[in-house]
Amino acid sequence: TAKAIAAFKDKQEYLTDFVRNKKSPRVENPIKIIAIPTTSGTSSELTCWATIWDKEKNNKLSLAHKSLYAEKAIIDPSIMVDKPLGLTISTGLDALSHSMESIWNINANPVSASHAIQASKLVLENLPLLTKDLRNVELRSNIALACVHAGLAFSNTKTAIAHNLSYPVTLNYGIQHGIACSFTLPMITKSMVGIDS
């Protein structure tokens, strides 16, 4: 990803070492990141993670480092209106997965829960409408806001079981990430309702 490249700048061998040997990453003088997302789902513009899909070894790696927080995030829903239906659904479900996993997460706290609940509501209210009106900037704005709330939520908690279960589905069957995450959400949510740690 661009964030990983920015972190390692001219030391790409450190990135290769991280991917191939899972050695702790050495980050020296990273490039400052200005993130302009073109979809609403990953929240990478708000988090300290970079995702690397190693298709050769059939593995997904997450690189976490404070330098991976964007210096600035510019969120402009008007540049998202040309995204196709499948991508819109997948990225929206990724934001929903981030938020719901933050609600039941062992690391949840009042701040993360507040953001997660707001994100979940926004996705559930707006994504079905957006699938019927893809060029609607107001609906895109609401999903972008949901993504911001979800990013702030899971930045505090990290993701949980739905994401962990999704990686083999994406790697082995080519199912888009957000769709793969969403398969297990109903079952996991049902098992979590009423449980309070």
Model-derived regions: residue spans:
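A general structural signal for well-ordered alpha-helical segments in protein cores
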Residues: 2, 93, 120, 162, ...
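Carboxylate- and glycine-rich phosphate/diphosphate-binding segment that chelates Mg2+/Mn2+
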Residues: 49-157
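Short, well-ordered alpha-helices that flank and scaffold nucleotide-derived cofactor binding pockets
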Residues: 3, 7-11, 156, 167, ...
